[in-house]
From Swiss-Prot:
Subcellular location: Secreted
Tissue expression summary: Expressed at a low level by the venom gland (at protein level).
Site positions for Reactive site: G29
Protein family (similarity comment): Belongs to the cystatin family.
One GO CC term, this protein: extracellular exosome
Note: Negative results: the recombinant protein does not inhibit calpain-1 (CAPN1), a C2 family cysteine protease and legumain (LGMN), a C13 family cysteine protease. Does not provoke cell death (PC3 prostrate cancer cells).
Keywords: Disulfide bond, Protease inhibitor, Secreted, Signal, Thiol protease inhibitor
PROSITE patterns: CYSTATIN
Protein name: Cystatin
Signal sequence range: 1-26
Domain Cystatin residues, every copy: 29-129
Gene3D superfamilies per the UniProt record, alphabetical: 3.10.450.10
Length: 141
């Protein structure tokens, strides 16, 4: 009897050990959840909002309401996958110097009946050693 249980014991111990690993263990090249308050996530979100406003043909700026979800992936640098809520502001885009993130965040919102909220998915690729950040994907609805 004891002999027949031996082959099962080793795989069972391995399975138990794997289940005890912390859930936040990073898988190389895989997506890992990140806290929405993480400073790197915050920087990526600021960049995404600025780029969204620069690329959008809307006449008004959109500001960040909140980061809904954040994940990262270790690539040649770090890629951040962000789900964010943006809200249309009363600040009109004008020719000349575009507003920076902090200025956009200070823009007033229109009255409740006129508010337009977007849910956006952004991918931001950061390569600090090259001093380069890129918005690689963006979709909003």
């Amino acid at each position: 009897m004891v002999h027949s249980q031996l082959p099962v014991a080793a795989p069972l111990r391995l399975l138990c050990a794997l289940l005890l690993l912390p859930s936040a263990t990073m898988i190389p090249g895989g997506l890992s959840p990140r806290s929405v308050t993480d400073p790197d996530v915050q920087k990526a979100a600021e960049f995404a909002v600025q780029e969204y406003n620069a690329l959008s043909t809307n006449a008004y700026y959109y500001k960040q309401l909140r980061i809904v979800e954040a994940q990262s992936q270790v690539v040649a640098g770090a890629k951040y996958y962000l789900t964010m809520e943006l809200m249309k502001t009363k600040c009109a885009k004008t020719t000349g110097k575009p507003k920076v993130y902090k200025e956009i965040q200070n823009c007033e919102l229109p009255p409740k009946a006129q508010q337009e909220k977007l849910t956006c998915h952004f991918q931001v690729w950061s390569r600090p050693w090259l001093e380069k950040v890129e918005l690689t994907k963006m979709s909003c609805n």
